[in-house]
Amino acid sequence: GLLVDRNGFPLQVGCFEGNKAEKATIIPIVTAFAARHSIEGMVVVADAGMLSAANLRELDEAGLRFIVGSRVTKAPIDLASHFRWHGDAFTDGQVIDTLTPRRGRNTDNDPALRAEPVWEPGEHDGSWRAVWAYSAKRAARDSRTLTLQANRAKAVVAGEKAARTPRFVKTSNGARTLDEASLARARRLEGLKGYVTNIPVEVMPAGEVI
């Protein structure tokens, strides 16, 4: 396990069994470093796949802060209020500060309310803070990627390309068809990037989280 600062400078190295995933090594590496140097107020930043729900809980219980990339598939849940009141409309640079369930779904973020809830640790113990940002540049890149994936799926469905079942292809009774519903859902989320954190807004505004 390798712990680095924001500039990539190595801070600590740890050795683990070769079959141990990063999700199982990051907590002991971080907590050992914090204990060794008597660090308080440390913020762990990681990609979406680096930390599990259990990891986030353990970091929080250890008194550590975190900012973790969120999977775009979480957007429909986190942004349910936005989609209900504003549809698919986003502006370049728009930021939405809201909540995300720690597990599954909960009622902390009520889509019936137009205003996004402000995360409070003591009040929303079933949720984390979620910050979502929209970028027109990212949307254009996502659109190109989805178009390529859709074209690949259409080629497989038409029998023009032999391959294992790609994204946006569904198989029913041995027949392959284009999964138009999944493609439409993916198109709806173009340009969005999310972050999950346990840092209150009064400590770190959304712009700094991003």
Where are these regions (language model features)?
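Anion-binding and metal-coordination hotspots
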Residues: 1-210
